[in-house]
């Protein structure tokens, strides 16, 4: 009789551990990674955009070293680039090629990592690319000054 109770108690304990083990992965699966949250924000940007083509994540700045609370807003900063895929496409942006000379946008704001109640507050601005033109060679400023002084002294 005593053995039967012990085995029944052990069975219940095992059942509780099994249920607890099954519940934990589903709770942690509710949290997005920093990158996943940004990709969701890019999807939302594409949904709200009136531009002909969709954008794809080009560059993601380092995640903040904040707390791990999925409900607290995390600062994000990233760049997106226009793709060749039209807005009407059913294809995920990651499968679209970047458009040659496509528009670049710099996006900043906050995201939450909670998968169910994820919030995005993102602002994107056109990102002007800086074109560096090669200037004709000229001697350093100090050399020009010395040359001017030398010419005036010699005349």
Swiss-Prot record:
Q: Which residues carry this modification: Pyrrolidone carboxylic acid?
A: 30
* Alphabetical keyword list: Antibiotic, Antimicrobial, Disulfide bond, Pyrrolidone carboxylic acid, Secreted, Signal
Keyword Cytoplasm found: no
Q: Which GO terms describe its cellular component?
A: extracellular space
Where does the signal sequence lie? 1-29
Give the Gene Ontology MF terms in alphabetical order: lipopolysaccharide binding
* Pfam families in the cross-refs: Cathelicidins (PF00666)
Q: What is its main location?
A: secreted
> Which residues form the propeptide in this entry?
30-143
What SUPFAM superfamilies does UniProt report for this protein, alphabetically? Cystatin/monellin
Recorded superkingdom: Eukaryota
Query: Where are the disulfide bridges?
Result: 85-96, 107-124, 146-154
This molecule's function is given as: Potent microbicidal activity; active against S.aureus and E.coli.
Family stated for the protein in its record: Belongs to the cathelicidin family.
Q: What name does the UniProt record give this protein?
A: Cathelicidin-1
Native species of this protein? Ovis aries (Sheep)
The lineage, from the top, is: Eukaryota, Metazoa, Chordata, Craniata, Vertebrata
């Amino acid at each position: 009789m005593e053995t039967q109770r012990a085995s029944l108690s052990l069975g219940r304990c095992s059942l509780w551990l099994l249920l607890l083990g099954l519940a934990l992965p589903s709770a942690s699966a509710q949290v997005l990674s920093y990158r996943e949250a940004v990709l969701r924000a890019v999807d939302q940007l594409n949904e709200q955009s009136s531009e002909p083509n969709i954008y794809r994540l080009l560059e993601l700045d380092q995640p903040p070293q904040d707390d791990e609370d999925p409900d607290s807003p995390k600062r994000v900063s990233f760049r997106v680039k226009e793709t060749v895929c039209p807005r009407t496409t059913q294809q995920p942006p990651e499968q679209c090629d970047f458009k040659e000379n496509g528009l670049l946008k710099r996006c900043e704001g906050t995201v939450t990592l909670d998968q169910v109640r994820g919030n995005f507050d993102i602002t994107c601005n056109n990102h002007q690319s800086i074109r560096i033109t090669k200037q004709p060679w000229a001697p350093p400023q100090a050399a020009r000054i010395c040359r001017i002084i030398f010419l005036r002294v010699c005349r």
